[in-house]
Structure formats: C-alpha cells, structure tokens
Amino acid sequence: MSKRRKGTIAELLKDRPRRGRPRRAVSRQNVYVALTPDQKQIIRMMVGRLPRGLVRADIPDLAIYLLSVRLEVLRLAVADRNREIPEGITDLESLYLLWDLPLPADNGEGKWTSIRLSPQRVIELGRARGVLNALFGVNRSQVFNLSLILFNQFLDSDLERKKTASLDEVVALISRIYL
C-alpha cells in the first residue's frame, strides 16, 4: 500500500489559528430580543464584575439558567396545588417584588439585537417565556430583561467573592444555592 502524502493545503492550514468568534464545544444559536440602552449598559457593567474565566458571551446563558432555576423553585413550592406560581403573584411586577428586584424602568422601545445562547438555554428561555406569557402576557424581551436583572442581583450577592470561576462552576453554584 502506498502512503498518502500530507502535503495538501488543508493539512497545512489545519493548525493555523482561525479568525472570528472562538469555537465552543456546543455551538450557540442566535435569539433576537429588544434591548434598551439601559439594559445594554447593565450588560457592559456586568462584564467588568465577572469572575476571571467568564466572558461577556456567558452572561445570557447564565442569566437564562438562573431564571429557569428560580421559576422551577416557584413551581416546586406550589406543586401540590396544581399551579405554576403562588396565588399572590398576579403580574410581572409582583414577581419582581417577590425576588426583591428593582422594577424595570419603562424608557421606550429597545433596539432588536441578537444574543447567542446554547441550545439548552434556548429551550429554557422558550419554556420561561411560554409560562410567563400565558400568565402575564409578556414577550421574549421582557423575559430576557427579567433574567438579566436576576443575574445582576446574583452577581452582586453570591458571585462577588469569587475571583475565578468557569461556566460549569457557576451553573453548579446556582443549582446548589436554589435547588
């Protein structure tokens, strides 16, 4: 048998660094939401407070995961009463108050932008949006805003003392705290 030569251009370029967005183990999907300038400013401020090992691209994934865990805790609290959330929560503002979150300022329409989420977080965002839309009539952008505010609170209270953390460590920390 003859040996194949490894002199092809593909073989030569295999180890060359790629341009563009860095590759991830699981490819991310674009999800479109409307963000106001204030919400974009919150994201920019969060980037500076993230532990080493996390990057800006991890913020949407972690925010959606935190929201889905918090909604799951609410659902488990009323599991014996055939409800999704407790009786006292009648609108989105009461959910903000339950979680001690600042109410979002209504400063007009946001501009549509894409966020990149892992496939599991896209499913969780859809599930959270479905529940909150059925209960309160909210849209995907409002659900993402709620998740951003939740993650900002989590960053201030539970993640501020961590200097380094990977994405998996923060997901485990969220699960350990709330579940």
Model regions and ranges:
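Short Lys/Arg-rich basic patches
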Residues: 2-40, 47-48, 85-123, 129, ...
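N-terminal accessory/assembly segment that mediates macromolecular interactions
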Residues: 23, 32-37, 42-72
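Short, basic amphipathic alpha-helical segments that act as recognition/interaction helices
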Residues: 53-81, 136-166
